[in-house]
């Protein structure tokens, strides 16, 4: 970027606004209840924006947008699922019941809700332990997305981008708790909404309009690399061939894994507990639906259309364009490259703030969940002293932050969408059955809930590590133990 003075001015204004909102959260955080569920009296508009911005992160924009650059508009089915399942079903069938159950039991966290309902300390601690281990991987994917864009925009090292980006987030989560998180999430979601609308409009303008852009994308089907075509890729405007490897990956991992897994996301379920009545959840539904439609629909459409831009300007498809400096193709660089090359500088600045907002809003919710799992649900002394619990949860934020940094430096390239889908799939497999039972099936026993969670965890890990080819190859455990990529 050439006009750095303008950008630094925008960034300074952004950071000042975040700092003020974080301070506002800090001023209103006087108890563990304030830190964990924002006092339970948040306005539904703020809750909807916080829910949407926590759900939609850089993994949705950069990771899944990049995946759309590879697999095309088939990812728009994920948009359908995120609205139908992630908003309508989530708010109507899960949000109201969750809020009523949480307030009736007087609980503050998702693991505590399951453990208290089934009268099982094992369920509470098993849930918290699983979140403590698995959520930093998802958080690392989000952090990687933000750092990658900063790396491309400022031409600085990935390590420096990661440290700087992460340091800003940890400060306001540490001091502001969930109140600070919700205040900043609402502000960031507004930036995200308008930033994505502008990017979509300029993308169509760059490519000659809506009709011309999609016709050009449809006409590029013959440019699909043979390696992808042999696995079922049928072009960027078509679904992959039914039953092929790519079809299974797109449908089972990306679309269904995330589209259904959203129902059992602990950091989202906590949002239902922050409003003062069940009626407020219904009032929040429209705002949440519009926001998520804009975020996912734009990201996946722009990701697919980036192929048209790169083909017109360099004769390459997006996947080939992401091979920078002799390195292999990196799906996570498709969206940053497209924005950097195709958009005016002021849009690049705005989009950088959009990505910062997306990443920070999601990471703040993730760090908050990790901290409460570590310091409250896994701590036998938690809850005995309100002031002490607040201190412990803030210490848990630091520990979650360090775990996430470790994963952010160790995960391989092109990992953002996959790591996100893995976490969502894990939550769907382990938490969704017992979560649904707690809300709708009172006859479920404690032992049944325990074995459901343990059995689902073991089965999910078996499928991921030994059966599903893409994930098994990533972890490499099956090949090390048995000499083959999958069983």
Give short role names for the model-derived ranges:
Residues 1-487:
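Membrane-embedded helix-loop-helix hairpins and adjacent transmembrane boundary segments
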């Amino acid at each position: 970027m050439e006009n750095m003075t303008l950008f630094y001015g925008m960034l300074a204004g952004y950071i000042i606004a975040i700092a003020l909102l974080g301070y506002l959260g800090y001023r209103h955080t006087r108890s563990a209840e304030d830190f964990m569920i924002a006092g339970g009296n948040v306005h539904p508009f703020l809750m909807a924006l916080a829910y949407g911005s926590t759900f939609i992160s850089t993994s949705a924009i950069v990771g899944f947008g990049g995946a759309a650059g590879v697999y095309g508009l088939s990812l728009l089915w994920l948009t359908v699922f995120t609205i139908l399942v992630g908003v309508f079903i989530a708010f109507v069938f899960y949000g109201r019941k969750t809020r009523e159950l949480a307030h009736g039991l007087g609980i503050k966290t998702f693991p505590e809700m399951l453990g208290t309902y089934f009268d099982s300390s094992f369920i509470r601690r098993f849930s918290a332990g699983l979140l403590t281990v698995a959520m930093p991987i998802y958080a690392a994917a989000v952090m990687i997305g933000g750092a990658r864009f900063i790396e491309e925009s400022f031409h600085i090292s990935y390590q420096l981008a990661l440290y700087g980006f992460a340091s800003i987030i940890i400060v306001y989560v540490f001091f502001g708790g969930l109140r600070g998180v919700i205040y900043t999430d609402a502000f960031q979601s507004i930036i995200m909404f308008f930033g994505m609308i502008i990017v979509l409009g300029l993308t169509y303008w760059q490519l000659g309009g809506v009709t011309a852009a999609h016709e050009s994308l449809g006409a590029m089907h013959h440019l699909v690399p043979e390696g992808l075509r042999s696995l079922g890729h049928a072009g960027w405007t078509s679904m992959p061939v039914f039953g092929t490897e790519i079809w299974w990956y797109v449908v089972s991992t990306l679309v269904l894994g995330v589209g259904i897994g959203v129902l059992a996301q602990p950091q989202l379920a906590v949002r239902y507990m922050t409003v003062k009545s069940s009626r407020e959840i219904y009032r929040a539904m429209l705002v949440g639906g519009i926001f998520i439609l804009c975020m996912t629909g734009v990201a996946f459409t722009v990701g697919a259309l980036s192929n048209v831009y790169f083909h017109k300007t360099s004769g390459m498809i997006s996947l080939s364009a992401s091979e920078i400096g002799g390195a292999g193709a990196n799906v996570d660089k498709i969206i940053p490259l497209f924005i950097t090359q195709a958009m005016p500088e002021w849009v690049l600045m705005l989009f950088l703030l959009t990505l910062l907002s997306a990443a920070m809003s999601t990471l703040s919710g993730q760090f908050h969940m990790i901290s409460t799992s570590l310091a409250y649900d896994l701590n036998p002394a938690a809850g005995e002293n309100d002031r002490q619990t607040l201190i412990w949860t803030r210490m848990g934020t630091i520990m979650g932050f360090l775990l996430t940094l470790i994963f952010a430096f160790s995960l391989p390239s092109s990992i953002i969408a996959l790591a996100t889908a893995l976490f969502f799939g894990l939550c769907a497999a382990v938490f969704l059955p017992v979560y649904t039972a707690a809300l709708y099936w009172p006859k479920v026993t404690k032992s049944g809930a325990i074995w459901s969670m343990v059995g689902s965890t073991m089965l999910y890990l078996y499928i991921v590590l030994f059966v599903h080819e893409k994930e098994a190859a990533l972890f490499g455990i099956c090949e090390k133990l048995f000499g083959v990529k999958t069983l």
